Amino acid sequence: VALLAAEVSGYRDRRATPRFAHEAGAALLLFEQLHDVRLHARHGRFYFPEDEMHRFGTHPGDLLAAQTTDRVRQLFAFQAERIQEYHRRALDYLPDVDRLDQCSLLVRLELAMALLTEIAEDGYRLLEHRISLTPLRKLWLAWRRRRGERRRFRRLPARE
C-alpha cells in the first residue's frame, strides 16, 4: 500500500524513494499488527513469528488472555523496536527532494510513532485496552509534520 501511495503522490528519486516507501510500509504494517493484536487474536489471526514467540516463552493463546504478562510485554517491546528500526530506515532513504511529495506517508508514520510511544509508556498493555490518540492530537501532529516539510522544502536549493 505504501508503494502505491508513493507512486500516487509522485517522486523524483527513482531509487531511494521506493525504498523509503517499502520500509515505511513495513513499519506501518507491523505497527498495525501490534496495535490491533487483541482484535486479531480474537479472530484467530496471530501475526508474530513463531520463533520470536518461542524466544520470549509465549504462544498464541497468551494473546487471548485478559492480562498482558511480562513475557508478552517483552514480545511486544521487541516488536516495537523492529517497527522503530523500519521507521528509521525509511526516513534515512527518503531524499529531501521528495519529502514534501511524500508528506501523506510521513504523516501516517508520525501518527503511528506517536501512538507507539503511548503504547510503550502504558507498558505495552495491549491485551487490556486499546490505546489511541485524540482527534485533536492527530490533527496537531499532522499539521506540524506538514508545516515542517513545507519549510524544509522551501530551504532546498532551486530546482531545475
Predicted regions and their residues:
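Catalytic cores of Mg2+-dependent Asp-rich isoprenoid enzymes
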Residues: A2-L28, L34, R38-E160
